[in-house]
Regions:
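Helix-adjacent hinge/juxtasegments
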Residues: 61-62, 66-87
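A generic structural signal for ordered secondary structure
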Residues: 20-22, 84-86, 116
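HotDog/MaoC-like acyl-thioester-processing domains
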Residues: 1-15, 72, 76-78, 89-143
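Hot-dog-fold acyl-thioester-processing enzymes
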Residues: 2-67, 123-143
Length: 143
């Protein structure tokens, strides 16, 4: 079976930490796949908030996630603090890619938990149409 392989781009645009909650733990006593999706969403929201943006106002555009891929590497457990590095990938007129490297430290060991990618589309809900990435948002993605 072919596996997803995510190569992280070079443009690092943020670092976020998210602690693992007991609600993130599944019947296997580790973080569930659905919780990883929520952690990635939380990281994106915190990254936007660093610049006073939200998914409803990214320098004037709303954001819609068009796709998501996750490459799981190791289990994560209650008590882990997940360090998420956010990277900017390919940018088009109306959309861009965000990549995420999720890791934690246990003892003195750095552990790669997962890599992920989301496709984000700029959207205007009033006209129900995609719109160009605002200039201020482009500057943030290209820093």
């Amino acid at each position: 079976m072919a596996r997803i392989k995510i190569d992280l781009p070079a443009t690092e645009i943020g670092n976020i930490t998210v602690p693992i909650r007991i609600a993130d733990i599944n019947y296997g006593n580790h973080v569930g796949n659905d919780a990883f999706v929520a952690i990635i969403h939380e990281a994106r929201m915190q990254w936007l908030r660093l610049y006073d943006y939200t998914e409803m106002n990214f320098a004037g555009a709303s954001l819609i996630m068009s796709d998501l891929a996750i490459e799981f590497k190791q289990e994560s457990f209650y008590g882990d603090v997940v360090n998420i590095t956010v990277f900017a990938g390919e940018i088009s007129r109306v959309s861009f890619e965000l990549y995420y490297q999720l890791s934690t430290v246990r003892g003195d060991k750095q552990i790669l938990l997962a890599k992920a990618k989301t496709g984000m589309v700029c959207f205007d809900y009033s006209s129900k149409k995609t719109i160009s990435i605002p200039e201020k948002a482009l500057q943030l993605l290209k820093k």
